[in-house]
């Protein structure tokens, strides 16, 4: 009886030991399989993001900026006029609607080149509440004037990602905003002889430096943020620029997405000419919405 009991104990101990070995091996294999499946799933998920990591990206949409514009233009005799607030003094609407477009080329894993275009045309008519000096003329109190401001901004920017991962990238920017501006005032008289006008136009190349970040938030969601600043005098143009942008992307279908965000730009330009000097300060900020299409091959992004 005791021998039988000892044989049973030895049998159960051996069975338990073998079961533990098998269980540990099975658990180890299961963990490896889960890890491999997780990696494969993550890679498959990233590969399924048709909007992310493409060579080319083009977008176009509308911008709803709130403007704040100040202009001061001197006369041909070298004397400056007075500072004019275009919204307050000339009746320009602060809130406007404009067109914006952008194109991006991902040259390599870390390098990208982009262009942007922004256009805004504004007009106003108002009876003056105070005397205004602009260019060679004085516009008296109670006179009706019409005014205009045309702005076009082109931007060329190069970005380099010093951190480049499949789901997020962070890098530096170097580029330039080139602004083509034309502003003017016209006195509306009863006769053609009573009318007179002045305008001031200039081109301002404004270089900038900045930082940017791009993040994959989910299968259909992405986030982009950038900020830029620079101040420099180039020939007869002394300029300062501060810009920023925050936008969220939602992938609607395959390579087509919608982006919504908030953008701001503040520019100050002093222009010196032989017979005419001008000061121009313009700031705007507001929401944007655009359609974005990504195409071309996919840039390889590494986890390490």
Task: For every predicted segment, state its role.
Residues 55, 96-100, 151-155, 204-208, ...:
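Transmembrane beta-barrel architecture of outer-membrane proteins
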Residues 68-96, 119-152, 179-202, 232-235, ...:
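Extracellular/periplasm-exposed beta-strand and loop segments of Gram-negative cell-envelope proteins
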Residues 1-4, 20:
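Positively charged n-region of N-terminal signal peptides that target proteins for export
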Residues 20-117, 288, 292-298:
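Short glycine/proline- and aromatic-enriched beta-strand/turn motifs that initiate or cap beta-hairpins
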Residues 110-113, 166-168, 219-223, 255-258, ...:
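Repeated loop/turn-to-beta-strand initiation elements of outer-membrane beta-barrel proteins
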Residues 222-239:
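Transmembrane beta-strand segments that form the barrel wall of outer-membrane beta-barrel proteins
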Residues 4-13:
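Sec-dependent N-terminal signal peptides
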Residues 60-62, 101-105, 156-160, 174-178, ...:
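Residues on the lipid-exposed face of transmembrane beta-strands in outer-membrane beta-barrel proteins
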């Amino acid at each position: 009886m005791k021998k039988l009991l000892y044989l049973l104990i030895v049998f159960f101990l051996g069975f338990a030991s073998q079961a533990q070995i098998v269980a540990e091996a099975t658990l180890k294999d299961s963990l490896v399989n889960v890890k491999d499946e997780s990696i494969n799933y993550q890679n498959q998920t990233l590969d399924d993001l048709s909007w992310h990591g493409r060579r080319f990206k083009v977008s176009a949409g509308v911008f709803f900026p709130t403007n704040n514009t100040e202009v001061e233009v001197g006369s041909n005799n070298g004397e400056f006029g007075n500072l004019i607030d275009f919204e307050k003094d000339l009746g320009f609407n602060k809130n406007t609607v404009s067109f914006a477009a952008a194109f991006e080329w991902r040259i390599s894993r870390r390098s990208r080149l982009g262009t942007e275009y922004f256009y805004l045309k504004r007009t106003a008519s108002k009876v003056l509440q105070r005397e205004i000096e602009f260019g060679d003329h004085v516009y008296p109190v109670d006179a009706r004037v019409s005014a205009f401001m045309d702005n076009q901004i082109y931007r060329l920017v190069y970005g380099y990602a010093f951190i480049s991962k499949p789901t997020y990238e962070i890098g530096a920017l170097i580029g330039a905003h080139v602004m083509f501006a034309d502003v003017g005032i016209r006195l509306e008289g009863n006769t053609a002889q009573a009318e007179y006008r002045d305008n001031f136009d200039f081109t301002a190349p404004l270089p900038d430096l900045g930082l940017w970040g791009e993040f994959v938030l989910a299968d259909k969601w992405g986030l982009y943020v950038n900020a830029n600043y620079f101040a420099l005098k180039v020939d007869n143009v002394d300029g300062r620029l501060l810009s920023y942008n925050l936008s969220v992307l939602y992938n609607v279908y395959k390579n087509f997405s919608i982006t919504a965000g908030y953008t701001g730009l503040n520019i100050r330009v002093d222009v010196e000419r032989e017979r005419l000097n001008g000061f121009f300060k313009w700031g705007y900020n507001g929401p944007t919405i655009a359609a974005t299409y990504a195409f071309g091959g996919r840039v390889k992004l590494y986890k390490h």
